[in-house]
């Protein structure tokens, strides 16, 4: 397995399995001299961790991060930062019935055929549990980006199954377990999820992520365009099946007179580009939407096969999220932060001394969106 590292100058390599003794990440390329403590990282981990409501997996993991290297006297040293999160609530016996079978929609079948061996306990390496070290590593990137540029990365759920969640205000996002930017719809979402759990089924979700105060110039055309790397990273999140940037697939029905974001001395009139033109950041908000599929591990019996190729019925009894999208918001924020951090360092290395006479216009003209 060779696809465990993300980034070029700011790299993150994750390790571990869902039911192993620990999971973690090695972060390399972080500039020296930045103040960093475990508490800085723990904030985002607590937003992602399991067992925080009845609507997510009831696996109880504290997800307490340990910094093993790369920080001395409270500051980054420029050397690799090793982050460790110990697994404490594994229950491997729940997976005894899938040792010889494959869950429909899960990585069981493909991992078996590719590697000839698979850790069936909680999905092993393919588990969404491995997003915890990603979130931990990204907390470092978020901190550096904010200190350098004032960059802020926020996300919210805009759809849960068939239920659309209209955006009303960012302040509501931390107030509910769905990361919904709408307080009024939370009771409906809770009723929806309670019914789904009783049915032994699962559902997908749509997540929106926005990065504000991003500097102009991030991205490396042609093949390391900023939006290309964002899409690549987002597709690395478990259960993500679609990525849109800016207007996304709505661009198909837009005319050029609408889609092209007009520039004025006061700022951009619109942001259909999602903050990226020609693979390079414009300084506008970077807007990303994710489509997340329903959880594969469900209590309803499904048709499958066993290792011999014979018909089998599969029902999963482990503790699972009926909608992995509920906890996906901080994970999506994390992936965007990692890509922006890597590209910020790459831009600084090659083009940090580039100067042009044209002024940088505001991200948004007054009265426009």
From Swiss-Prot:
The entry's keywords: Amino-acid biosynthesis, Aromatic amino acid biosynthesis, FAD, Flavoprotein, FMN, Lyase, NADP
Enzyme Commission identifier(s): 4.2.3.5
UniProt GO molecular function: chorismate synthase activity; FMN binding
TM spans (from-to): none
Enzyme class: lyase
Cofactor binding annotation: Reduced FMN (FMNH(2)).
InterPro entries membership: Chorismate_synth, Chorismate_synth_AroC_sf, Chorismate_synthase_CS
Protein family: Belongs to the chorismate synthase family.
Description of how the protein assembles with itself and partners: Homotetramer.
Protein name: Chorismate synthase
Species assigned in the record: Cupriavidus metallidurans (strain ATCC 43123 / DSM 2839 / NBRC 102507 / CH34)
Lineage, opening ranks: Bacteria, Pseudomonadati, Pseudomonadota, Betaproteobacteria, Burkholderiales
Gene: aroC
């Amino acid at each position: 397995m060779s696809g465990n590292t993300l980034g070029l100058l700011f790299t993150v390599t994750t390790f571990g399995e869902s039911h192993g003794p620990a999971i973690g990440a090695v972060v390399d390329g972080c500039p020296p001299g930045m103040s960093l403590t475990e508490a800085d990282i723990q904030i985002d981990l607590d937003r992602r961790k399991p067992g925080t409501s009845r609507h997510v997996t009831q696996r109880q993991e504290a997800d307490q991060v340990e910094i093993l290297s790369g920080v001395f006297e409270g500051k980054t040293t420029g050397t690799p930062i090793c982050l460790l999160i110990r697994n404490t609530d594994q229950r491997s016996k729940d997976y005894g019935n899938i040792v010889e079978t494959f869950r429909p929609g899960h990585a069981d079948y493909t991992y078996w055929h590719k590697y000839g061996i698979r850790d069936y306990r909680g999905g092993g390496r393919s588990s969404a549990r491995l997003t915890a070290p990603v979130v931990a590593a990204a907390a470092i990137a978020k901190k550096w980006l904010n200190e350098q540029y004032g960059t802020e990365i926020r996300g919210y759920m805009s759809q849960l199954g068939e239920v659309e969640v209209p955006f009303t205000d960012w302040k509501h996002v931390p107030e509910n377990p769905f990361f919904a930017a709408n307080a009024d719809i939370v009771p409906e979402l809770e009723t929806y999820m309670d019914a789904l759990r009783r049915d032994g089924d699962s559902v997908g979700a749509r997540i929106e992520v926005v990065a504000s105060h991003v500097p102009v110039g991030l991205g490396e055309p042609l093949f390391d365009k900023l939006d290309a790397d964002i899409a690549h990273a987002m597709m690395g999140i478990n259960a993500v099946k679609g990525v849109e940037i800016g207007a996304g697939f709505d661009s198909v029905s837009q005319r050029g007179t609408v889609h092209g974001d007009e520039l004025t001395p006061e700022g951009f009139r619109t942001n259909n580009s999602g903050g990226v033109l020609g693979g390079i950041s414009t300084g506008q908000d970077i807007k990303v939407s994710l489509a997340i599929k329903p959880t594969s591990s469900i209590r309803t019996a499904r048709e499958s096969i066993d290792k011999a190729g014979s018909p089998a019925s599969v029902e999963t009894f482990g503790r699972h999220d009926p909608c992995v999208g509920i906890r996906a918001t901080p994970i999506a924020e994390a992936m965007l932060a990692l890509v922006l951090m890597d590209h910020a360092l790459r831009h600084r290395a090659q083009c940090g001394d580039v100067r042009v006479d044209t002024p940088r216009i505001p991200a948004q003209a007054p009265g426009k969106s």
